[in-house]
From Swiss-Prot:
The gene is yciB. This is Inner membrane-spanning protein YciB. InterPro entries: YciB. Keywords: Cell inner membrane, Cell membrane, Membrane, Transmembrane, Transmembrane helix. NCBIfam families: ispZ (TIGR00997), PRK00259.1-3 (NF001325).
Amino acid sequence: MKLLFDFFPIVLFFIVYKFFGIYTATAVAMVASLTQVAFYRLKFQHYEKMHLFSLAIIMVLGGATLFFQNPWFIKWKPTGIYWLSALVFYGSGYIGSKPLIQKMMETNINLTTKIWYRLNLAWTLFFIVMGALNLYVAYHYDTDVWVNFKLFGGVGFTLLFVLIQAFYLTKHTDEKSFEKQ
């Protein structure tokens, strides 16, 4: 259910774009992101950092898209999120005691420090590639193709990456790791 909630703004953006165009879809995505953050705060009594991060980016780039009537700002949003995520993941390997991926997953899985750092680097590289791929699609194809890629390509590649990662992790864990769940 949380996964569907996380994709709420992008799914609304996609649907509204198909009927009303990029500017209305951008405005709806901005409102949906704000609603998402407020709802999460009311329901769980705290903010989800990723929601706040995404909200800040969509408000700035979505606002610029609407103000300048230029869709290129919103087309840069996924790349901004991907590349800032890459920077955070990469930096976490040097700042603090553990890489970010370990902080996120260590209660569910037991890995060596070396594997945690490899996994963190893999996510860093994934985010860099996804940001570049978003720009490639945005600059080489029309907006219709980019909107489809934003939803289906972004989600599809992420699920594929998680699946590949799961296979990789099975080689580096034992059954006791999964008993914690």
